[in-house]
């Protein structure tokens, strides 16, 4: 009976596979949104104010960072919790494949969230005249919460490795 439960629990890790695949569909949606933004800005490029162009570019950078985060979580999560990726030797491989454990994945996710939050905060500050001061305060507080959390996670990770 114990062996049955252990095998069933171990096999249940495959329930994560469709979730990771679903993230790839999210990446596809993000890609479509990215190009929608580009096609939206191209006809207006010469009439667009510099600050507005910078806001669009920050949005594109934001989407690129989120896309990278999705890829990292999909691939590392699959490798850590479901199965190793069997990639042909003649195919190009990402240099971090097979090297990111759940602890380093957490740190990379935290760093990515801080970077994404930083870009978002920069966009907010570029449009600060149109945003209520109390909202600005909350944007900064939320961003600092992400920063402090990332530092705390890194510190705790360092403590547990020594």
Curated annotation (Swiss-Prot):
It is found in: Cell membrane. The chain crosses the membrane at residues 10-32, 53-75, 134-156. Belongs to the UPF0114 family. The keyword Hydrolase does not apply. It is a multi-pass membrane protein. Keywords: Cell membrane, Membrane, Transmembrane, Transmembrane helix. InterPro entries: UPF0114 (IPR005134), UPF0114_bac (IPR020761). HAMAP family: UPF0114 (MF_00143). The lineage of its organism: Bacteria, Pseudomonadati, Pseudomonadota, Gammaproteobacteria, Pseudomonadales. The keyword Transmembrane helix applies. GO terms for cellular component: plasma membrane. This is UPF0114 protein PSPTO_4583.
């Amino acid at each position: 009976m114990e062996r049955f439960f252990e095998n069933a629990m171990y096999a249940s890790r495959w329930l994560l596979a469709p979730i990771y695949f679903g993230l790839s569909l999210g990446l596809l949606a993000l890609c479509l949104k990215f190009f929608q933004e580009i096609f939206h800005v191209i006809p207006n490029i010469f009439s667009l104010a510099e600050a507005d162009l910078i806001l669009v570019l920050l949005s594109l950078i934001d989407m690129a960072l989120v896309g990278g985060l999705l890829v990292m979580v999909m691939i590392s999560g699959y490798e850590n919790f479901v199965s190793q990726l069997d990639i042909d030797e003649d195919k190009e491989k990402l240099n971090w494949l097979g090297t990111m454990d759940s602890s380093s994945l957490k740190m990379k996710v935290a760093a990515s969230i801080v970077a994404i939050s930083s870009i978002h905060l920069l966009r907010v500050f570029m449009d600060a005249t149109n945003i209520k001061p109390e909202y600005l305060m909350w944007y900064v507080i939320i961003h600092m919460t992400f920063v402090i959390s990332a530092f705390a996670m890194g510190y705790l990770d360092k403590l547990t490795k020594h």
